């Protein structure tokens, strides 16, 4: 009986780890739909550290679980002109170090895993208010209302071991569609965004188990104040809802109802060199990680 309970609990831990991996879409990231000049490249290096409490459903005999995640990300993006629209195409490759510590049936337990995460390809199109501009035209551009859409694909190439609970990759495709709006009034910029996250099934959870997940809804809003060229301060919130999972066809009551708030500041180091500092914090988390995340990003424009 104890062995069966242990197996069931281990599968529940897998589902919680899935929630932690999907939580990256819930980060507060300002200025996702700002216009960019065509023909310009952006190379970014990002380090992020997340720490905090991990929340499981009541069927899991785990207590006082704390998690630490160190993430290193390299991304390359290029501004494009497609049909007169401003388009940003980007590719990001993460490397993560995940560690969990807590009590299992009252006894100390821990786990750690390092490796490459799932690469993400993102295509963002500004549908209104941000035409494709050359770098020379972009310098005199005054944004007002911008409507944009983006589509991201998470490719299951990250490190995944079907015999392990903790994994850096998800072993499934993830698609994220978003529609966003930004409006500029003087030095102030207001943003809102809605999206849906879809994921394919994973048929290799602990070798023989099948994981499915309902779509997850995403809402985000924020406000930014521009001090001058390249210098701004922003804050906002994000919300994830839904995403119930099925394990071997049995639906679980583990939908997300997670709120996060955050702030970011960006400033230039020199011409073509930009730094950004971000901090996000979990306000409420039903399933997954109630984490605080600190991120430092450097971007080279050329």
Enumerate the language-model features and the residues they cover:
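Outer membrane beta-barrel transmembrane domains
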Residues: 209-302
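Outer-membrane pore/translocation modules
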Residues: 97-212, 254
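Residues on the lipid-exposed face of transmembrane beta-strands in outer-membrane beta-barrel proteins
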Residues: 45-47, 74-78, 121-127, 151, ...
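Repeated loop/turn-to-beta-strand initiation elements of outer-membrane beta-barrel proteins
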Residues: 53-54, 84-87, 131, 187-190, ...
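Outer-membrane beta-barrel biogenesis signature
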Residues: 22-44, 129-145
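Transmembrane beta-barrel strands of outer-membrane/channel proteins
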Residues: 43-49, 89-97, 149-155, 192-198, ...
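Residues that define the transmembrane beta-barrel architecture of outer-membrane proteins
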Residues: 39, 66-74, 114-121, 145, ...
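Surface-exposed strand-loop-strand hairpins of Gram-negative outer-membrane beta-barrel proteins
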Residues: 50-71, 109, 162-169
